[in-house]
Amino acid sequence: MDLDLGVRRPYSRRGFLLGALSATTAGVLAACSQPSQPAATSAPAAQPPAAPTKPAAAASPAASPAAAASPAAAASPAASPVAKPAASPAAAAPPSPAAAAGQFSASNPPPVQNPNKSFAGATVIYYGDGVGIGNDLDKATAQRFEQDTGVKINVIPRPQSATDTFAQYQRFFQGQSADLDVLMVDVIWPGAFAPNLVDLGPKLGDATKNHYPGIVANDTVGGKLVSMPFFSDFGTLYYRKDLLQKYNISAPPKTWDELEQQATTIMNGEKGSNPNFTGFVWQGNAYEGLTCDALEWLASSGGGKIVENGKCTINNPQAVAILTKMKGWIGTIAPRGVTTYQEEDARNAFQSGGAAFMRNWPYAYALGQKDDSPVKGKFDVAALPASSGQKPVGTIGGWALAVSKYSKNQDASIEFIRYLTSPEVQTYRAVVGSFVPTIPAVASDPNVQQAQPFLANLADVERVARPSSETGENYNQVSTAFFQAVNNIENGQDPGSVLPQAQNQIQRLLG
């Protein structure tokens, strides 16, 4: 299998400090205490055509398969961190992969532990990561699994947009297609897809004891383990620390007003040598990623969490104010093309040296620190800003792995998931790709903490999540209505007119 190395997302409710981590870092790796409810089972609305403006690709990563990336949303909210860690799950401690972590490179994943060769000769079709370095790590681990077990893994990158991925999976399941064996599942999807997924409990139940119990609960529907935790996620602010120093800015912005001021100062100074330099980039396209970003804007400004207590709450003065402010960023501190950006577009703009600030997920950290990255050693990660008097927030999420009920190679597929979700592979992915682990023993590994130093900066961030619990099977339609409304505002429409209409539309969906 060829490795084309080069160049992903969002868990559910109330975060609590876990495992043997330091209290600071552990708060960032909070698990969810309540499982999310099913996301909608109807296909997502069609996406509007993208505007032409795109950032130049960053030097470091290889091109990704689709035009843009997606985070796939978060499930129910993990609230602010608690001061002391909870005990890690009661189970035999997983083997420590720390000693081997330093030997990992993208093309050198760990071997399969006690490989099961009973299914040698089988072929497993894996719809894996389509964003950032994730596809490269999928290819490398697939190659290693094939080498150790004799099972061939056909890696197919999922669409980079989570919205498009959801629709693609629906088509597979509606046709009961055998052309899908292992699939990546966003944290808000287990309930929606549960009838089409294999119960992993009989084969992988013991392995779940290694993972944060709240995340396992999110992957359990009706007493069945329908997916296995793969990695976690949350929204963060990337900033050019060298440029802050250059322009005598003492610290990254803590408020949205400060972000505007700092971005303007840096832009004015940099445009002389780089006319295309911009201040701030994010995921502005009309897709699930914009729901994550806009939820952060609202929740960090007293504007609510989209749906609360069964009611859509987006039409309020605080939401109007922050979205009016965001609208003002377009064409000033942000490029007009940001209204079409997904994860990789934003990362490419930032990593190529063309932006001062970026909202993105942890995966971008490892890519930005690669040897061929123009911004290696020049950036850091902080909490996203908030409005004055409000707390910083970050949409939290992650992905899991599942086996289709219509797969013809279910046992081989389960063995592949056992490998991908093992402590050894989670350590490899955390060290090489800055994927946030779901296993406490991995999160507390010094090698992982060294590879993800930014986590210590994020302990005080309140975790928020998309309202999948509140909206149940209507979530996908609710999110679509919300992100389309926000994208309309980005493209010039008045928040005072758009939000009442969107709130009425969402409320009708809720009944």
Protein language model annotation of sequence segments:
Residues 93-118, 186-235, 260, 275-276, ...:
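Hinge/lid segment of periplasmic solute-binding proteins
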Residues 115, 170-171, 178-183, 207-244, ...:
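A structural signal for short loop-to-beta-strand junctions that line the ligand-binding cleft
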Residues 144-214, 218-220, 242-254, 349, ...:
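Extracytoplasmic "Venus flytrap"/periplasmic binding protein-like
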Residues 99, 106-113, 218-219, 379-383, ...:
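Long, aromatic- and glycine/proline-rich binding clefts that accommodate carbohydrate-like moieties
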Residues 226-230, 235, 260-311, 355:
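Extracytoplasmic/periplasmic solute-binding protein
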Residues 262-264, 309-340, 384:
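Glycine-centered hinge/linker elements that transmit conformational signals in sensory
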Residues 1-11, 19-31, 417:
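N-terminal secretory signal peptides
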Residues 50-110, 117-118, 245, 462-511:
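Conserved C-terminal helix/tail region of periplasmic/extracytoplasmic solute-binding proteins
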